UniProtKB/Swiss-Prot annotation:
The chain crosses the membrane at residues 15-35, 62-82, 512-532. The modification Phosphoserine is found at S386. The keyword Transmembrane applies. InterPro entries: ST7. Keywords: Glycoprotein, Membrane, Phosphoprotein, Transmembrane, Transmembrane helix. This is Suppressor of tumorigenicity 7 protein. Belongs to the ST7 family.
Amino acid sequence: MAEAATGFLEQLKSCIVWSWTYLWTVWFFIVLFLVYILRVPLKINDNLSTVSMFLNTLTPKFYVALTGTSSLISGLILIFEWWYFRKYGTSFIEQVSVSHLRPLLGGVDNNSSNNSNSSNGDSDSNRQSVSECKVWRNPLNLFRGAEYNRYTWVTGREPLTYYDMNLSAQDHQTFFTCDSDHLRPADAIMQKAWRERNPQARISAAHEALEINEIRSRVEVPLIASSTIWEIKLLPKCATAYILLAEEEATTIAEAEKLFKQALKAGDGCYRRSQQLQHHGSQYEAQHRRDTNVLVYIKRRLAMCARRLGRTREAVKMMRDLMKEFPLLSMFNIHENLLEALLELQAYADVQAVLAKYDDISLPKSATICYTAALLKARAVSDKFSPEAASRRGLSTAEMNAVEAIHRAVEFNPHVPKYLLEMKSLILPPEHILKRGDSEAIAYAFFHLAHWKRVEGALNLLHCTWEGTFRMIPYPLEKGHLFYPYPICTETADRELLPSFHEVSVYPKKELPFFILFTAGLCSFTAMLALLTHQFPELMGVFAKAMIDIFCSAEFRHWNCKSIFMRVEDELEIPPAPQSQHFQN
């Protein structure tokens, strides 16, 4: 019974919806019928005669003024549309049409079923889009005190944004703190230091934490009833305090390396103690996880110090040992540091071995992986590559593989080639990057430009082939070729990560909507007609009459511009030009 009632209600609802769909036609005919019935009381014929008389008495100046007013309004609309597009990246009228007019016309109802049906199929791509818009820690980030601050002293510009430094503060609190820090005075001070915005306050807090560790605890041990002896015991050092001083206070890489070595001694001792106690409870497990992060960070930065100071082989050994000791800590992306160091040594076979392990479909990609793979394939053919010869004989198999690798890399991050080809100036890379964005391109090119220059002909091959990628993906925001569609969020995130004096690279280039171009053309054409009509009213009237006659004629397709001007000359009765005196007898 209930099912029958439900079915009846559904049928009644569908009938009402159907009736409202076609009810407007009934109302239209009713209005026409009322107008016809009331034509005499409303004096419709008299009103129409008055309107026609008014239109006949209008002078051409009125139409010129009307045209000029419409041109002015069109110009104001154009200026507003251009401002709205520059600020928000979309057309105001198109947005209003899609957001407000389309639901009124039933567009949302038609698409809602399709969206609900395809929601499960698009869930993977949505998750991928969110992951691609995630901000990552730059594995090759510079030292604040020894590199970023020196740049500020020389140029007076701040290379890091507040948003970037705030993300670093959050990373430090995640990696270097735990819930049991309040039990140790030095760690409690450092927990507050990582939250400080003022660099001097952070440095002062780090020194305070080290001074607390220098306090010696004295324990009385009675040896004889009449005498005592004082046993001196040192508290463990605070490794995170040394990390902060090495990152922000040290003005050279050598000073930073000394502080990191002191941090390594303290961090290694804390790591060994917490490793023995990690199974005694969740508190000890969290402390061991924190000590592991501290130790890995210190060793990685020591390897980067060795790389900066020219001890590249030592840096490679330290990175390999670190990856063997902690294979599961992929959050630091140490393999990207290793790839850069191996390229500096020109150990291309080792680079290929690392790529074979990390250039996997199940692992997240990066510009370092994609462009390093392209560099290795370009290295095999770049020294003999010639675009003229390739156009004559075609590409060989090796050249085709190199071109495909370049296209793959450019599709992943299309901003990198402009920096490698020095079409855009480089700046210091930020501490955080957005994969496939301009920030990642800067971070990659800053360290790898020298490696591309070292391979003969590699930049030439890149210059000849990188733009061909865009022909394969004409709509990169909707569909990709080898990767997911290019994320829309990169421009906004890069503007937050990169300093204001840098011009952020935007992909794909935003083109003006058709409505803005159409409005601009219509406004210009109308204004030109108004000006010509005001200056030459008789000529424009004759020209308009000739155009109307031509458009109304059945032989319009046989007319051309010459025929139009001949018709205008006939209307104006322009006499023929006098014959030149040189041809008179």
